[in-house]
């Protein structure tokens, strides 16, 4: 396991977690992910911590309300999500994670358009 640090663009939201080194990331084609264009990964929640400046953390939900998609209200960056489908885990935007080059990772496609 490796400790990772992450943040939104303006730094108002910071988060850290432990995970295995990233070799791949996921691209989802659901209606939300296809619009935000992020590469994501599921990480264990045991050591996930976040800190946000007051009023900076926004949350978006829609449809069946199964997921909470968190973003920075200052810079607009999608940071991480929580879902009832994966309790105790977080879905992180790998573009926010320090030292992770998303262009160097293998891409796994998730057909959220049909499976969610």
Where are these regions (language model features)?
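A short Gly-Trp-Pro
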Residues: 1-7, 12-116
């Amino acid at each position: 396991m490796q400790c990772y640090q992450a943040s939104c663009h303006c730094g108002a939201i910071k988060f850290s977690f432990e995970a295995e080194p990233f070799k791949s990331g996921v691209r989802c084609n659901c209606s939300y992910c296809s619009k935000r264009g992020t590469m994501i990964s599921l990480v264990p929640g045991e050591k996930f911590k976040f800190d946000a400046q007051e009023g900076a953390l926004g949350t978006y939900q829609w449809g069946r309300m199964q997921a909470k998609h968190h973003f920075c209200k200052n810079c607009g960056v999608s940071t991480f999500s929580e879902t009832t489908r994966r309790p105790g885990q977080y879905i992180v935007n790998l573009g926010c994670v320090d030292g992770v080059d998303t262009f160097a990772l293998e891409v796994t496609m998730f057909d959220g358009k049909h499976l969610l």
